[in-house]
Amino acid sequence: MIRTVDIYDTSIIGVFATCTEDLALVPPLTKPEVCTILEEALDVRVVETLINGSTVVGALSRGNSNGFLLPYGSSVEEMQKRTGVPAGILPDRLNAVGNIVLANDSAALVHPELSDRALEIIARTLKVEVYRGTIAGIKNVGMAGVVTNKGLLVHPKVTVSEREALEEIFGLPVNIGTTNFGTQMLGSGLLANSKNFVAGSETTGPELGRIEEALGFLE
């Protein structure tokens, strides 16, 4: 099975796409063969879309099985029509949603400066408990880690206290890793759900092995 791809001829696939248990959002004109790989590997339906007119779909949106979060100015109706799940809009100036929200179907870790109102919208849309925090001191937690319902992989410089908080929030063991030949902001190069994962094309064999282990795909 193919485990690495490019989107728009770049390996930072997590910037341009995002996925849940059932859906993958990709920008228009993503190569058909890439869409097929995502569909087959992740067992999802691929939806081509722009977010606020932008192709950086992964940086600007975050979802789980219950809904999708979008930045201010996005069309909730259009997203709900395309995906078939509810959508919510973050009102804050911090609205590169994929960069600042790390979520699975049970919990979400978010940028520590998000407002109480934003946390309420996240909780209501994704139907999860929401917590503020950092990973390796980084506030853009959505790109500093990847979480599924089976596993959690984060930036190699995560602190002991952050690791303990993450384990408590998500109820999963915390593993460290990289993508794309040493990229520590590993969310930029990885799409994953509880069924499988796809990484950026520059991700090495050892990195793939680490991802596979961390996200629970080794028997």
From Swiss-Prot:
- Keywords associated with the record: Initiation factor, Protein biosynthesis
Record-level Gene Ontology MF annotations: ribosome binding; translation initiation factor activity
User: What Pfam families has UniProt attached to this entry?
Assistant: eIF-6 (PF01912)
Q: Which SUPFAM superfamilies match?
A: Pentein
Q: Which domain of life is it from?
A: Archaea
Biological processes annotated in GO: cytosolic ribosome assembly
- SMART domains attached to this UniProt entry: eIF6
Q: Which family does it belong to?
A: Belongs to the eIF-6 family.
Its job: Binds to the 50S ribosomal subunit and prevents its association with the 30S ribosomal subunit to form the 70S initiation complex.
Q: What is this protein called?
A: Translation initiation factor 6
